[in-house]
Amino acid sequence: MSMKLVKRVPTGEEIKELYPLSQELKDIKAKRDEEIRKIFTGEDKRFIFIIGPCSADNEDAVCDYQNRLAKVAEQVKDKILVIPRIYTNKPRTTGDGYKGMLHQPDPNKASDMLEGLYAIRKMHIRAIKETGLTAADEMLYSENWQYVDDILSYVAIGARSVEDQQHRLTASGMDIPVGMKNPTSGDYTVMMNSCLAGQHPHTFLYSGWEAHTDGNPLTHCILRGALNKHGRSISNYHYEDLRLLYESYQKFNLVNHSCIVDANHNNSGKKFDEQPRIVKEVIHSRNYDPDIKELVKGVMVESYIEDGNQPVGGGCYGKSITDPCLGWEKTERLLKDCLLYTSDAADDLIGVD
């Protein structure tokens, strides 16, 4: 056979018993979840920043970054709510390359997914304990949800997973916001249908059980750019793209109309230095159009300690080993700039025509 079963993996409950969340951290998560929920329902008008490394490759570097981020998050909290990105599993276009801490707790060693499950849970818990900020992660594998359902405050479903039925149905059973990215083709209808599936109740097989869900009213869209037939990046963060999404929402029976704009990936053409400009243009569009302001709840930014990226084993602390990221100094400046840009009557500061 081409597939071999290597080792039994513990259930979510078994791993939670090994690495439990204290009552103090449970209370932090409950408070954070409520704050974030209110932004997606429109009760809280703050702007969301989902920000952090492309991939969480090293616990110490990631937690160092999160501690820096927490200090700035405190300074901007009146206008901006920060959700750290701690992405522990990575989709790979060709199947090659570093697939995240779940696969390789140590990027320089062989894959060990059991140790990876331990590692991602320990890192998420450490980050909450040190910073008081619960995080976002990508749901690359739908069955992984059972291992992190008590520690995450936001989940993204990627461009290659968004059409998958198991991802959609699993999202319908979550009680936190789930962002559905547009597929690599850029088709809004696929993304909207994913949101529709996520907001409806379902019965399906999950992790050896027949499961029933109630539907997730916080399922929403993420615009991340697209690829044309020649493999070139097409952005979809401009004003006309946001208007098109607003109009698309009117045609679907969805609640809590919301969008997050991913400032990297095909929106930037993976030119990480473009992210601050893209974020500011999105805020400009929000300030210009009340409909867009109501729709666009925030942005997603890839950021780490050092600018750019490096190969696995490159040896530079806090530098991405997957997609290039914005360095810390530029990240801090962006957040503080956006504190001004999201304030009342501040649009003239942005300088975007």
Which residue ranges define each predicted feature?
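Active-site-facing alpha/beta catalytic cores
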Residues: Q66, K79-L244, H265-K270, E274-E281, ...
